Amino acid sequence: MSRKQFTLFDPVLLKPALWSAVLKLDPRAQWHNPVMMVVWCCCVLLTIVCGVQFAGDSSSEAVFSLGVTAWLWFTLLFANLAEALAEGRSKAQAASLKGLKKTVVAHKLAAAEHDAVSQPVPADSLRKGDYVLVSAGEVIPYDGEVIEGVASVDESAITGESAPVIRESGGDFSAVTGGTRVLSDWLVIGCTVNPGETFLDRMISMVEGAKRRKTPNEIALSILLVALTLVFLLAVVTLMPFSQYSVNSMGHGEPISVTVLVALLVCLIPTTIGGLLSAIGVAGMSRMLAANVIATSGRAVEAAGDIDVLLLDKTGTITLGNRQAAAFLPAPGISEQELASAAQLASLADETPEGRSIVVLAKQRFNLREHDIHALGATFVPFSAQTRMSGVNIHDRMIRKGSVDALRRHVASNQGHFPPEVEKQVEDVAKTGGTPLVVSEGACVLGVVALKDIVKGGIKERFAELRRMGIKTVMITGDNRLTAAAIAAEAGVDDFLAEATPEAKLALIRQYQAEGRLVAMTGDGTNDAPALAQADVAVAMNSGTQAAKEAGNMVDLDSNPTKLIEVVHIGKQMLMTRGSLTTFSLANDLAKYFAILPAAFITTYPQLGALNLMHLSSPQSAILSAVIFNALIIIGLIPLALRGVHYQPRSAKSLLRRNLFFYGLGGVVLPFIGIKVIDLFLTLMGWI
């Protein structure tokens, strides 16, 4: 990747983050986080108490209150810093995207043809539906679809990948993005957006969105944290009259002070996760962008972590995607050359890799030269997901090629007969994992073109990982059932959908969702748009059509369908990070009980000294040590919140057990050690 990656505490990010953390001390900024708002109120209260004490005669009590007050403000500041660092990384990424926007001159065409009259205009004046000519060395002014031409395009400014890509009319690689550069040849591009609606504009808006919407899980966790805060607030408030009653009843001791009560409240409420919760969500989206995936919202990232069904396109995801014509298998009474000639004619205007490979194979095997489709007076019939075949009409000749079922229906509709020998050829090709493409002329079946595809190395192991995580994998392919079954068995997927149409994909997604499952899928074509819109996590390819990108809730800048698996990992990592830090935060309270409660009541109930398990030097030292630890642990956990916990592909039960051991037990043990070390330091320095 050529895009700059920032370290956690990069000075470029740290300086503005520190200033932003100070600005976030404004109560209006704290209002969105109820837990930290309570801490802010406690800070203000203690600041007033501290001022009153210094104005009075209780100087020793005032010094103690000053120490507690200062560290409570630091607690708030550190929580703000975590969020500011996460937001700073997103803003830096947005700034890098803004740097890609260039003011360029576009060559606007009067018509969608290379030879049409052109005039130079500012790119900002272009509108949806306009056509432009972009030649070698020029920057593509706007997002659009390639209407004519084939060119090598440098997309490193967008994707970070230095290797150029081919963009061409027809097929799934016709979309181009404004800000990228044409390296060779030329392209006629039809603009698909208006000013302010370009891919870069939308990405910048998503990345630096001023107000990030909370995700459902985040809202649920926030409600839990608020409930816990209210419970602890009520419990602490009751300690004041209880303390007064105890002093009067026992005849000795001192009532608990406001400073101690506030310190106890802040240490008991879930400030750790409360301070880091927003940062975890922002960092999740930032990690997606680091993986070259733009998420439209944190909701999409979170949904990726809950996914339990993955719909994966066979071509490009499970297989290498470069299916090539390998053999011509003629029907009885048809020569191989006749089949090759017809297949070549049907493929002359076919811009897909498969279509071009048929033309090349016919030329290699029989020296059949390409024809000019216009000179032949031919009419090309394009492929569609509904008909699942393409071809050409030349005078009274009607040549078609396509899937077995589509050609069987086509031949039958022309009162033709589908030979059993061809059925056998189809089965033989499919059983070996190849794709049979049937060719016909009129009502006569000419034979089969065998296409070969290769399963990607290591993909079977990745599917095994997903299975251990409880995720079901489903391969989506337009191939017949025999071919699909052979490739599915080789790749190790759990299920497959053969002869897939847009309607079939949409129905399958709805079926899984009706069972209460969350579904993820990738897509790049306009025909994928309905299914992408229905899926819970929909990753559209950057090289795909505008309709696909608008229907999805994520865009993969690398246009790599396999990235869906990485998206799921990042989503699960975000959920695990949130759960782990919540467990750690709640487990922290145990040590703070043993530090603060005995210290608060020891003058009234000396017997509580037995609960001083850490042998803290004095009540004031115990309370201040707990407050300092409560603040420092937020700083200590910022790297974990921003990077995410280490995720391993395991079952939910295994992950829960590991989570409870490391973050539950760790959350109990670490505060005992930390508070004791801070107490020793304070005593050694003579500050208590």
UniProtKB/Swiss-Prot annotation:
Its EC number is 7.2.2.6. It catalyses: K(+)(out) + ATP + H2O = K(+)(in) + ADP + phosphate + H(+). It comes from the Bacteria. One of its GO terms (cellular component) is plasma membrane. The chain crosses the membrane at residues 35-55, 62-82, 219-239, 260-280, 594-614, 622-642, 668-688. It holds the Pfam family E1-E2_ATPase. SUPFAM superfamilies: Calcium ATPase, transduction domain A (SSF81653), Calcium ATPase, transmembrane domain M (SSF81665), HAD-like (SSF56784). It is found in: Cell inner membrane. ATP binds at residues 350, 354, 383-390, 401. Keywords: ATP-binding, Cell inner membrane, Cell membrane, Ion transport, Magnesium, Membrane, Metal-binding, Nucleotide-binding, Phosphoprotein, Potassium, Potassium transport, Translocase, Transmembrane, Transmembrane helix, Transport. It is an enzyme of class 7 (translocase). InterPro entries: ATPase_P-typ_cyto_dom_N, ATPase_P-typ_P_site, ATPase_P-typ_TM_dom_sf, ATPase_P-typ_transduc_dom_A_sf, HAD-like_sf, HAD_sf, P-type_ATPase_bsu_IA, P_typ_ATPase. Mg(2+) binds at residues 524, 528. The keyword Ion transport applies. Disulfide bonds: none annotated. PROSITE patterns: ATPASE_E1_E2. The keyword Transmembrane helix applies. One of its GO terms (molecular function) is ATP hydrolysis activity. Part of the high-affinity ATP-driven potassium transport (or Kdp) system, which catalyzes the hydrolysis of ATP coupled with the electrogenic transport of potassium into the cytoplasm. This subunit is responsible for energy coupling to the transport system and for the release of the potassium ions to the cytoplasm. Belongs to the cation transport ATPase (P-type) (TC 3.A.3) family. Type IA subfamily. The system is composed of three essential subunits: KdpA, KdpB and KdpC. PANTHER family: POTASSIUM-TRANSPORTING ATPASE ATP-BINDING SUBUNIT. NCBIfam families: ATPase_P-type, kdpB. This is Potassium-transporting ATPase ATP-binding subunit.
